[in-house]
C-alpha cells in the first residue's frame, strides 16, 4: 500500500484560547491521514475519528484501503487535549472531514466509530439528519447549521463506548471525600483497598453505583453554580478550569463475573489503581463548559440515544475480551439500532485489537462484506 496522504482541512474558529498555538488561532485547521486504495476502489470512503485521540495511524486504515475503501484517520481540533473539548464543536470538525471527502469525488462516505468515536459518530449522524443541538449544554448557541453536517451513508461502530457521560458515571471513584485532595478517601467505597472479596455482593455493587452517581451529581451542581456566578459577575471570565481526581474505578475491572465477557482482570490501560490515581486520566482536566458538554448528565452526545435518532444502516463490532465495553454496552447499542443494526462478534478481541492481527483482518473483512451488502 502507498503511504498515507496528509490532509489539512480548514474549520471554523472556536472559543478564545481553545488552542495555545497562535498559528492555529489565526487559521484553525484539523489534520488527517488518508489511505487510498490502489486502482479504482469502490467509490466509498470511511472516516475514523475520536473526540480527542490521535487516529491518524489507526489500525483499520490500511486494511480497509486494501479492500477498496479509502480510509481517513481524522483528528479533531482537540487531539491530545480534551480540557476545553466541546462535543458540539467536534461535530463541526467531523462535518468538515465529510465535506472534504465528498469534494474529492467519493460517492459514499461512512463513519467508523471506534472506542469513544462511536458516540461521536452517532451524535454526528443524528444531528446531520435532524439538527437539535442549536445550543451547548450551558445555554450558549452552537451556531451549527445543516450545511456544516452533511449526512453519511452508514455507521460502523467497533469496541464502542456508549459516550463520555455514561463512561465517567461508571468509572468515577466514589470514595473521594474532598474534590481538592487526590488522596482523601472514604475506605468504605475504596474499590482498591481490598476490603471486599471478589466476586462482589450485588448489594455492595448497587451501593457503589449509587455513590458514583452521587459524586457525579455533586460535581455537576458545583459546575452549574460556579458558571452562574461567573455570568452574574461583571468582568469575570466566561469559563474556568478545574480538576476531577480519581476517575477510573469500576467494579468490573476487578470482578470479571460482573457483566461477564472474555476480558482479563484490570484496566485496558494497565493497573487500574495506578490509572485511577494518575496525574492525567479521563476527565481529569476540565472547564465548566467542557464538563457539561462531555461528562455531565445533560450531555447531548449520549451514543445509544443519538443512534436511535438515525436512520442509516449500522454495523456493531463487539470485541468479546474488551475490558471497557461489556455485554450490557452491546445491548444498549442493539436496542438503539433495532432492525437496522447488524452485530459482528470479534471473539477474543481486546479493546484495541493489540497484538491481534488476525482479528484486525477479520474486522476489516466483516466491514467490507457488510458495506457491499448495505450500500447500493
Q: Model features per residue range: what roles?
A:
Residues 108-180:
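Primarily recognizes the serine-hydrolase "nucleophile elbow" in alpha/beta-hydrolase
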Residues 188-305:
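Alpha/beta-hydrolase
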Residues 310, 316-318:
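Short beta-strand/loop motif that positions the catalytic acidic residue
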Residues 61-83:
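Conserved alpha/beta-hydrolase
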Residues 1-44, 356-357:
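N-terminal cap/lid segment of alpha/beta-hydrolase-fold proteins
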Residues 318-342:
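Conserved loop-alpha-helix segment in the C-terminal half of the alpha/beta-hydrolase fold
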Residues 349-361:
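Catalytic histidine-centered segment of alpha/beta-hydrolase-like enzymes
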Residues 58, 167, 299, 322-329:
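Conserved alpha/beta-hydrolase "acid-adjacent" motif
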Amino acid at each position: 500500500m502507498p503511504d498515507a496522504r496528509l490532509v489539512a482541512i480548514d474549520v471554523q474558529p472556536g472559543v478564545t484560547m481553545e488552542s495555545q498555538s497562535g498559528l492555529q488561532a489565526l487559521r484553525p485547521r484539523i489534520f488527517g491521514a488518508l489511505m487510498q486504495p490502489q486502482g479504482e476502489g469502490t467509490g466509498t470512503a470511511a472516516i475514523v475519528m475520536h473526540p480527542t485521540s490521535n487516529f491518524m495511524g489507526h489500525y483499520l486504515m490500511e486494511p480497509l484501503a486494501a479492500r477498496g475503501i479509502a480510509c481517513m484517520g481524522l483528528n479533531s481540533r482537540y487531539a491530545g487535549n480534551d480540557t476545553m473539548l466541546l462535543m458540539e464543536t467536534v461535530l463541526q470538525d467531523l462535518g468538515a472531514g465529510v465535506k472534504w471527502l465528498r469534494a474529492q469525488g467519493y460517492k459514499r462516505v461512512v463513519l467508523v466509530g471506534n472506542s469513544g468515536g462511536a458516540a461521536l459518530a452517532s451524535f454526528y449522524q443524528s444531528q446531520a439528519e435532524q439538527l437539535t443541538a442549536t445550543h451547548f449544554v450551558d445555554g450558549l448557541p452552537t451556531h451549527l447549521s445543516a450545511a456544516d453536517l452533511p449526512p453519511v451513508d452508514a455507521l460502523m461502530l467497533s469496541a464502542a463506548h456508549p459516550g463520555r457521560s455514561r463512561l465517567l458515571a461508571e468509572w468515577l471513584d466514589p470514595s473521594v471525600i474532598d474534590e481538592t485532595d487526590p488522596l482523601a478517601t472514604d475506605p468504605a467505597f475504596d474499590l482498591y483497598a481490598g476490603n471486599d472479596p471478589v466476586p462482589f455482593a450485588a448489594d455492595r455493587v448497587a451501593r457503589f453505583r449509587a455513590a458514583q452517581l452521587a459524586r457525579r451529581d455533586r460535581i455537576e451542581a458545583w459546575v452549574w453554580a460556579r458558571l452562574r456566578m461567573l455570568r452574574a459577575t461583571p468582568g469575570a471570565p466566561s469559563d474556568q478550569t478545574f480538576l476531577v481526581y480519581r476517575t477510573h474505578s469500576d467494579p468490573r475491572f476487578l470482578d470479571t463475573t460482573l457483566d461477564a465477557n472474555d476480558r482479563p482482570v484490570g484496566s485496558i490501560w494497565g493497573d487500574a489503581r495506578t490509572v485511577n490515581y494518575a496525574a492525567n486520566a479521563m476527565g481529569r482536566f476540565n472547564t465548566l463548559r467542557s464538563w457539561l458538554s462531555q461528562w455531565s448528565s445533560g450531555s447531548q452526545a449520549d451514543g445509544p440515544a443519538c443512534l436511535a435518532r438515525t436512520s442509516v444502516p449500522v454495523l456493531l463490532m463487539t470485541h468479546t475480551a474488551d475490558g471497557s465495553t461489556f455485554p450490557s454496552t452491546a445491548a444498549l447499542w442493539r436496542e438503539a439500532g433495532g432492525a437496522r443494526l447488524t452485530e459482528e462478534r470479534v471473539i477474543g478481541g481486546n479493546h484495541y485489537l493489540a497484538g491481534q492481527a488476525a482479528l484486525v483482518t477479520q474486522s476489516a473483512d466483516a466491514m467490507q462484506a457488510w458495506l457491499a451488502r448495505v450500500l447500493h
